[in-house]
């Protein structure tokens, strides 16, 4: 079984600071600390559980700037077999429509897969659109809001998914795209052995930086060396995927973020009431005055 997992490095929305909006309506992610989107970690965990039971491999892919390689190294620490960074300046400012187009074409290039996993949604946009849109572009079934994988057969999977007021059991043919809820599983911790093994994994962009100003290092040789050590993170650009530029980045994105802000709930005026019988009487009187009681 081959599982491809869509992961994302997201801005830590709990710590919004500085000027995070650009004039063109896109988010300046460099102004925010970056973290591994939690539901994507859970999606990776489910993919790894399938590998543990049935064998096969797990490939983690992400679309983002060069620094998004950090989240791919975390995937390798957790147990992924391969990692792919999809990065190009022409992808900047992509909304879910443009993102799903790029991801679907990357998945087609990787090919030969049984499952595509993704978190239900990312905490930066909360749209829950990329997974379903990617499935549509791939022309494969999709099951969203997954709580549990119940059974896997050679050509099908049975899944429990959350719905309003309960759950439903669905069976789908393979390949299938599955979006995962945050409580579907608990992500395994990173293993020290894998951290030591993959902490030096590098993308092509990072290898190119190593060769800058060093005439003794040649990028092709360095790439070959890292590939032989299984430390190379495959890097795909718009040209590698032969994409339509009009469908990428800002040009292919009809959606724009109008505003983002940190909402702080501040307490108003309050009155301390003693925790005794007299205080209880005062509290009841005030609740009755406000028509909360009586």
Put a short name on every predicted segment.
Residues 1-294:
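N-terminal glycine-rich FAD/FM-binding segment characteristic of electron-transfer flavoproteins
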């Amino acid at each position: 079984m081959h599982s491809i997992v869509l992961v994302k490095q997201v801005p830590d929305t709990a710590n919004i600071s500085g000027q995070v909006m650009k004039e063109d309506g896109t988010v300046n992610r460099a102004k925010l600390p970056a973290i591994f989107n939690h539901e994507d970690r859970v999606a990776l965990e489910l993919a790894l559980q399938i590998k543990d039971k049935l064998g096969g491999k797990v490939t983690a892919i992400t679309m983002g700037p060069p620094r998004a390689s950090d989240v791919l190294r975390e995937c390798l620490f957790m147990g992924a077999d391969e990692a792919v960074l999809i990065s190009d300046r022409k992808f900047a400012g992509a909304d879910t429509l443009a993102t799903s187009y790029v991801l679907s074409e990357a998945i087609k290039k990787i090919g030969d897969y049984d499952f595509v996993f993704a978190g239900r949604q990312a905490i930066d946009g909360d749209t829950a659109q990329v997974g379903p849109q990617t499935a549509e572009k791939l022309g494969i079934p999709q099951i969203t809001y997954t709580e549990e994988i119940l059974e896997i057969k050679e050509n099908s999977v049975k899944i429990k998914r959350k719905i309003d007021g309960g759950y439903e059991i669905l069976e789908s043919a393979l390949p299938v795209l599955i979006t995962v809820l945050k409580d579907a599983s608990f992500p395994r911790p990173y293993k020290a052995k894998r951290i030591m093994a993959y902490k030096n994994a590098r993308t092509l962009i990072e290898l190119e930086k190593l060769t800058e100003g060093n005439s003794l290092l040649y990028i092709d040789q360095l790439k070959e060396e890292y590939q032989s050590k299984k430390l190379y993170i495959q890097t795909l650009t718009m040209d590698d995927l032969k994409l339509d530029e009009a469908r990428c980045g800002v040009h292919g994105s009809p959606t724009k973020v109008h505003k983002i802000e940190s909402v702080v709930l501040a307490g108003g005026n309050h009155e301390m009431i003693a925790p005794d019988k007299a205080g209880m009487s005062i509290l009841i009187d005030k609740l009755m005055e406000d028509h909360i009681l009586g």
